[in-house]
Swiss-Prot record:
The keyword Secreted does not apply. InterPro entries: Micrvir_lysisE. GO terms for biological process: killing of cells of another organism. Signal peptide: none annotated. Keywords: Cytolysis, Host cell lysis by virus, Viral release from host cell. It comes from the Viruses. E protein is responsible for host cell lysis. This is Lysis protein.
């Protein structure tokens, strides 16, 4: 087997330095999948919180409490 010369080692290191960023680009997104799902969960919780805090007032003075409109002051 042939020994590597200094020129061979430098060429190998140059090739490695050119390939390393592309390897990182391939593997980094899979590391952040958990963070993305956590962000979606927080966004959903915020949306549900905003929806539950909306004030509802009766549409008319009728006795049916199920007919409601959204209070325009909150928006």
């Amino acid at each position: 087997m042939e020994r590597w010369t200094l020129l061979d080692i430098l060429a190998f290191l140059l090739l490695l330095s050119l390939l390393l960023p592309s390897l990182l680009i391939m593997f980094i997104p899979s590391m952040y999948k958990q963070h993305a799902s956590l962000w979606k969960a927080r966004s959903l919780a915020k949306t549900l919180s905003m929806a539950s805090s909306a004030r509802l007032t009766p549409l008319s003075s009728s006795r049916t409490p199920c007919v409601l409109k959204q209070d325009s002051k909150k928006l």
